[in-house]
Amino acid sequence: MTTASVIGAGSWGTALATVLAQRGIEVKLWCRAPEQAAQMAASRENRRYLPGVTLGELITPTADLKATVQSGVILCVIPSAAMAEIADSLAKSQVPQDSILVSCTKGLERGTGRRMTEILSASLPDNPIAVLSGPNHAEEVGRQLATATVIGCNDQDIALRLQEIFTLPWFRTYTSEDVAGIELGGATKNVYAICAGISEGLGLGDNAKAALVTRGLAEMIRLGTNLGGAPETFQGLSGVGDLMVTCYSAHSRNNQVGRMLGEGKNIDAVLGSMTMVAEGVPNTVSFYEAARRAGINTPIIDQAYAVISGHKSPDIALNELLNRNPRPETDS
């Protein structure tokens, strides 16, 4: 394979383009804004979203979607709210039927609860679909720091092909057939990262943060298995691995959102101060809705939703979590 396309030139899309280029693959990196494509082509750097990382000569920034999609592998690295629009645009752009579509977006569709691969499959039913997810901060991948990730696909031959494409001495790739579990783990952890950030903003210590993250994992498994994921997947890189890096890293946008909420800022002010999308905010609403539809007990998601929607202050939400009726640890 000599060509690949990356739809979305944010920090993660740009970082993945550099991974592919290091494998000797020609990469078309699609930007929604023509001026961004021109800036990146001229400076060989994504100054807005991934400054300091040089774009190799095999990476071609472009704003021409139809020309971009004529590749063997197409990575979709866009905000979850835009996935349905992009999927429809890809279908209209006559994507080759043998092109492998890989979702690298962590979220659920608002209102429907559809996973990103389900959205892609609905618009492009004849194409093979996969997911790539794990504890992967773009800033570290761009600097070629040691990283591991998971590729999920129902077709293991395709998963193995993608594994080969994405493997570098410093970028280790595993495979899995549990597409749903991989996607659900990667999306739910964004909610718990906001909660971990709230605990920091409130000035609580490591004990409280560790409790939130651990109970968040239990809640992730409880909800995720009900929505179609395998329990063991949530114990892997795309589950607990991604949860840890997102809750504890300074790179985490969702953690930053939570920290500012805990410090007393309202959600509009928080989001207005950010240049990149924090998926945990729409994810919180989507998983709150999904849990209600499924009848699953999700006390942490419930309180996160109450804070984000402005119904409760962070300190009241935390107090209600701490003062739930006592129960065995293995109970929900």
How would you describe each model-predicted region?
Residues 82, 93, 119-127, 146-233:
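Internal alpha-helical scaffold of NAD(P)-dependent oxidoreductase catalytic cores
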